[in-house]
Amino acid sequence: MATTGTPTADRGDAAATDDPAARFQVQKHSWDGLRSIIHGSRKYSGLIVNKAPHDFQFVQKTDESGPHSHRLYYLGMPYGSRENSLLYSEIPKKVRKEALLLLSWKQMLDHFQATPHHGVYSREEELLRERKRLGVFGITSYDFHSESGLFLFQASNSLFHCRDGGKNGFMVSPMKPLEIKTQCSGPRMDPKICPADPAFFSFINNSDLWVANIETGEERRLTFCHQGLSNVLDDPKSAGVATFVIQEEFDRFTGYWWCPTASWEGSEGLKTLRILYEEVDESEVEVIHVPSPALEERKTDSYRYPRTGSKNPKIALKLAEFQTDSQGKIVSTQEKELVQPFSSLFPKVEYIARAGWTRDGKYAWAMFLDRPQQWLQLVLLPPALFIPSTENEEQRLASARAVPRNVQPYVVYEEVTNVWINVHDIFYPFPQSEGEDELCFLRANECKTGFCHLYKVTAVLKSQGYDWSEPFSPGEDEFKCPIKEEIALTSGEWEVLARHGSKIWVNEETKLVYFQGTKDTPLEHHLYVVSYEAAGEIVRLTTPGFSHSCSMSQNFDMFVSHYSSVSTPPCVHVYKLSGPDDDPLHKQPRFWASMMEAASCPPDYVPPEIFHFHTRSDVRLYGMIYKPHALQPGKKHPTVLFVYGGPQVQLVNNSFKGIKYLRLNTLASLGYAVVVIDGRGSCQRGLRFEGALKNQMGQVEIEDQVEGLQFVAEKYGFIDLSRVAIHGWSYGGFLSLMGLIHKPQVFKVAIAGAPVTVWMAYDTGYTERYMDVPENNQHGYEAGSVALHVEKLPNEPNRLLILHGFLDENVHFFHTNFLVSQLIRAGKPYQLQIYPNERHSIRCPESGEHYEVTLLHFLQEYL
């Protein structure tokens, strides 16, 4: 430890840190010593990580005499268990005001192990876990049919179902789920219960769509796109599957959608059930080879991966229909396609971002996006617009002639922007009354004002009259419906949360819509309610001083909130809305019961402090700082700038950071100051703020980070600006390299994890949204590709450490490979740490520990 010297007050910052006595020296530990420090803190994070219940489903109990109002189902990790399971809690009708009622988590399933034997997942399951960023084992999702009480879920490389509620009442002790046997080889992915007849369920097997009857075991393959060949190149088609880019960049994880209603046809009483699905042809998409997890076999896995500027898959929407008799036997199946080719009807459409059905099954709907992602259309497709698929041209023409002239697609809404469209789920069509030619719906839109807000829209469905047997080329505004009215329900410089799976809950009886948003502060998420009849007052339902993630009950009388703050670990509470029925907007939330109380923080945990500052261009930015635990007056501490910096992410907010970012506290406990700043480009601050990156990724973010560093150094006085490290993963890895390239005098070292080093090698959906296609933005691509600027990197060794998972199928190892070969050609020093068995996220605990020890060791030696 250095002795404390008191620098004279009039010397500048840099001068003060020249005085060796003022420099705080981090204590050096051996590799083993650092391992035991990491072990100590990991023990704690295991206690609370992933334990919180999620994926809630409220079911009302109807017996008047019983003590409980609802049964609440959810996924969670019971105490002492290592995997997620299906659980439930009973919510009592009455609670004592002053008592804290802790609901017990009850097991639904009896002695059930859901993780596959030895934790080995199929390739499809493993890649889906990557796309969804799932770290937990066990049951990670389930489908539920409320009337019949049927649950369906994937587990142990198979499918299972069980029933609770429904006709047979509620169980009181755990049950054995029933495995659904199959003739299919390979995993059955994306299973869903048929909403119109829960005897049937669907799944994807080997890239085709199947249905099966739970009661009789009958299985039927509905589509025949995939041949099941071992070579990816020879087998480019799939049905009902979301492709890599759609999952990774648009958060859509399914490629098919059940019609919620059945139709009866003919005198025999046959019932028709329908599924809308996306058919994909990837024959023109580039194939890349990524090392296979079975490294010792020296194999590679082949993937279709569309690089920016190259061909995307060819897509179409189709219908699969099947008919069943009164015994539930499948009598016939039929594949239907649009009356004209998809690309003729919708020539500008590059991506199907979302799809579904209106509740009455009268229309399928889809959200279409163009390739630059600056134009979105919401389109209704009546099932009668689809005709039987056939190779026979005469039959096709006869079917097309039979489609009534007034049957057509309807474009009911359009969004246009010069920035980019952030795709989300929020679209709520109201039921149409008989013979009505209008569709009323709720929609969130960010393009109108630059902030995401809720609108109530009424579109007039005007049919033009088409002869579908004639060749067709659409005009500019083909199928576009007049908008009769569009009422803003929310407004202002804040946003309604719509991305990343955010939901709204609509109570059609009281004409209220419940939503989550940042109305009070960009640092907190809250649950709000507003009337969609008489738009006006917006009422907040959650407690300020915390950030909440909420789920409403089906009858709008209760909600669950999972909430935390920077200083309080997460807890999960159930609230009941109570008050006079004649003023539902102002019903007050009353704490009802707790499902999980906040765990205690680890003994050495000191939460970060949130700060804000104004940049030279007068933009308000937020940051957080972890103060070194061993602060001594006058001492300057080495500082780690932890960075992400890209779009769609917000690191600085009033939620607990001690689980995912526990490592930042470890750094502070060792004597480092840790700074995190959300600069321009991060989310939750509106489209203009995020859009600062448009066409110039890597060119604006470092400025904001450096200004934030300087602000913190002045405000706190313990930061040693001559010893600053920059570190991050993914986009943060890319910016760590950018920092060392453009500001080598600010950053002494950079530690870059899984960085994008050349934008030309990244995918279409992400890169083109933010950077356009390469031919339109050559300068932006070159300026933003770190591998093309290695000559600016420092010549001193031990200033650059690169980390990357060798199996990464998102930011391919190619990026690091290319960067390193450029470094070698330029004669630049670097250090490289490869994780041979990891993908884009480090999964294996040993790899995670190794990375953390490597980070601490590199910092103590070279910062």
From Swiss-Prot:
GO molecular function (one): aminopeptidase activity
The protein's name in its UniProt record: Dipeptidyl peptidase 9
Gene Ontology CC annotation, any one: microtubule
UniProt KW keywords: Acetylation, Aminopeptidase, Cytoplasm, Disease variant, Hydrolase, Nucleus, Protease, Serine protease
Outcome after substituting G138S: In HATIS; likely pathogenic; decreased dipeptidyl-peptidase activity; less able to maintain NLRP1 in the inactive state
Free-text tissue specificity from the UniProt record: Ubiquitously expressed, with highest levels in liver, heart and muscle, and lowest levels in brain.
The EC number(s) this enzyme carries: 3.4.14.5
Assembly and binders: Homodimer. Forms a ternary complex with NLRP1, composed of a DPP9 homodimer, one full-length NLRP1 protein, and one cleaved C-terminus of NLRP1 (NACHT, LRR and PYD domains-containing protein 1, C-terminus). Forms a ternary complex with CARD8, composed of a DPP9 homodimer, one full-length NLRP1 protein, and one cleaved C-terminus of CARD8 (Caspase recruitment domain-containing protein 8, C-terminus). In the ternary complex, only one subunit of the DPP9 homodimer is bound to NLRP1 or CARD8.
Record Pfam families: Dpp_8_9_N, DPPIV_N, Peptidase_S9
Activity at various pH: Optimum pH is 7.5-8.5. Little activity below pH 6.5.
Catalytic activity: Release of an N-terminal dipeptide, Xaa-Yaa-|-Zaa-, from a polypeptide, preferentially when Yaa is Pro, provided Zaa is neither Pro nor hydroxyproline
Active site per UniProt: S730, D808, H840
Annotated control of activity: Inhibited by the serine proteinase inhibitor 4-(2-aminoethyl)benzenesulphonyl fluoride (AEBSF), and by di-isopropylfluorophosphate. Inhibited by Val-boroPro (Talabostat, PT-100), a non-selective inhibitor, which triggers pyroptosis in monocytes and macrophages. Val-boroPro inhibits activity by binding to the active site, mimicking a substrate-bound state, thereby displacing the C-terminal fragment of NLRP1, leading to activation of the NLRP1 inflammasome.
Residues at which Val-boroPro binds: S730
Residues modified as N-acetylalanine: A2
Positions of region (Disordered): 1-20
InterPro entries, alphabetized: AB_hydrolase_fold (IPR029058), Dpp_8/9_N (IPR045785), Peptidase_S9_cat (IPR001375), Peptidase_S9B_N (IPR002469), Serine_Prot_S9B/DPPIV (IPR050278)
Protein's GO biological process: negative regulation of programmed cell death; proteolysis; pyroptotic inflammatory response
Domain of life of the organism encoding this protein: Eukaryota
Task performed by this protein: Dipeptidyl peptidase that cleaves off N-terminal dipeptides from proteins having a Pro or Ala residue at position 2. Acts as a key inhibitor of caspase-1-dependent monocyte and macrophage pyroptosis in resting cells by preventing activation of NLRP1 and CARD8. Sequesters the cleaved C-terminal part of NLRP1 and CARD8, which respectively constitute the active part of the NLRP1 and CARD8 inflammasomes, in a ternary complex, thereby preventing their oligomerization and activation.
Family from the record: Belongs to the peptidase S9B family. DPPIV subfamily.
Associated disorder: Hatipoglu immunodeficiency syndrome: An autosomal recessive immunologic disorder manifesting in infancy or early childhood, and characterized by failure to thrive, short stature, skin pigmentation abnormalities, pancytopenia, and susceptibility to recurrent infections.
